[in-house]
């Protein structure tokens, strides 16, 4: 089996991740719910994970890191916690439904939403931002990189625009956290939402957000906190304010191990290897008859993704053949990014997405490219 669906979830993790989860299953209690060793050990796991992520993102304090089940939950928490009826938001057509659907629901409640388009290479049209600006514009919400094309967002340019106009700068880092260096202080990011199970190399069911210390986010959930139990209102201090209920300590133990491994290896080093693998694949398939590649493969930074179609063949059929005949795992279809597909003209066909990990080998990439070329020849001869 050749696994090239890492933008959906990374299958291959460092062995330390599994070891940490198994150890936590047998040793961790419920953090903040007692003074015995199992609960204290759980609290140490949670703190260690905050510290690791704060180091990775260059956050000023570990209390800026809050945990959730995934990036979707983190985005819902942040967007619903800072936007109100009458506010205006600028976002992009590159966004995942984890951004779009919360914004659509907020739009039904009186929040106005404007979308930035893309050019022929699926690059953001940054110049549109100035034309979309309103007196009531409250936030700029962007993805770090498209989960369809891999095209990255120029976060420095986005930050400059947001800061010049006094906007909140919110980033969906589902595809970039752990895959690209991110310095939230240097960029002046107000909220960075991430998932644990992709490039951060943790297990599914983990994720969260960096929230700028002075930013107040109204909690999406309230309830048990382990502190101030006689208060009717949920505690306001961070990170407790945004972490109602028992945390996924076992998952966080694995996430911490994954992040620590990333820090040891160096995100820049791993990103360079992934970029080289994506480039190797692209160079071998881009001239194959009938193959169309989407996105700007020359731009940097970008996610290690190559999205393509073969003639007019349904992307799902291509993915099925790649798995059944070649043992290659890829993702086909809409990728939960409907506006991106409208911009690309691939609403009906979808695209076949190959996404690479530093755990992949050159041989695997070459085999996948050869399979695409062979399949393209077969389809064109049908």
Where are these regions (language model features)?
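Pyridoxal 5′-phosphate
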Residues: 1-382
């Amino acid at each position: 089996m050749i696994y090239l669906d890492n933008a959906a979830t990374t299958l291959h993790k460092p062995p330390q991740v599994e070891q940490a989860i198994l150890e936590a299953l047998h040793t961790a209690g419920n953090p903040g719910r007692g003074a015995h060793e199992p609960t204290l050990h759980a609290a140490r796991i949670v703190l260690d994970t905050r510290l690791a992520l704060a180091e990775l993102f260059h956050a000023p304090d570990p209390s800026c890191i809050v945990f959730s089940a995934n990036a979707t939950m983190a985005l819902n928490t942040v967007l619903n916690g800072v936007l109100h009826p009458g506010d205006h938001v600028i976002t992009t057509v590159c966004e995942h439904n984890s951004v779009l659907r919360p914004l659509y629901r907020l739009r039904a409640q009186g929040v106005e939403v404007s979308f930035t388009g893309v050019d022929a290479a699926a690059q953001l049209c940054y110049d549109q931002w100035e034309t979309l600006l309103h007196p009531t514009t409250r936030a700029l919400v962007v993805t770090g990189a498209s989960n369809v094309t891999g095209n990255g967002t120029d976060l420095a340019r986005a930050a400059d625009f947001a800061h010049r106009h006094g906007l909140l700068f919110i980033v969906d880092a589902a595809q970039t956290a752990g895959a690209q260096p991110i310095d939230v202080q240097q960029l002046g990011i107000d909220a960075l939402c991430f998932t644990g199970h992709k490039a951060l190399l943790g297990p599914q069911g983990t994720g969260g957000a960096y929230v700028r210390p002075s930013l107040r986010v109204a909690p999406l959930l309230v309830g048990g906190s382990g502190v101030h139990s006689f208060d009717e209102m949920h505690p306001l201090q961070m990170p407790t304010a945004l972490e109602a209920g028992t945390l996924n300590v076992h998952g966080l133990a694995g996430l911490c191990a994954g992040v620590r491994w990333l820090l040891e290896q160096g995100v820049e080093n791993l990103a360079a290897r992934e970029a080289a693998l994506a480039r190797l694949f692209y160079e071998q398939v881009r001239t194959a008859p009938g193959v169309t590649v989407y996105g700007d493969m020359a731009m940097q930074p970008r996610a290690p993704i190559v999205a393509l179609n073969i003639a007019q063949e349904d992307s799902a059929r291509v993915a099925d053949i790649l798995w059944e005949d070649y043992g290659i795992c890829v993702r086909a279809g809409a990728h939960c990014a409907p506006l991106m597909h409208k911009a690309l003209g691939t609403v009906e066909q979808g695209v076949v997405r190959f996404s690479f990990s530093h755990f992949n080998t050159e041989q695997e990439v070459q085999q996948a490219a050869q399979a695409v070329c062979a399949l393209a020849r077969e389809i064109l001869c049908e």
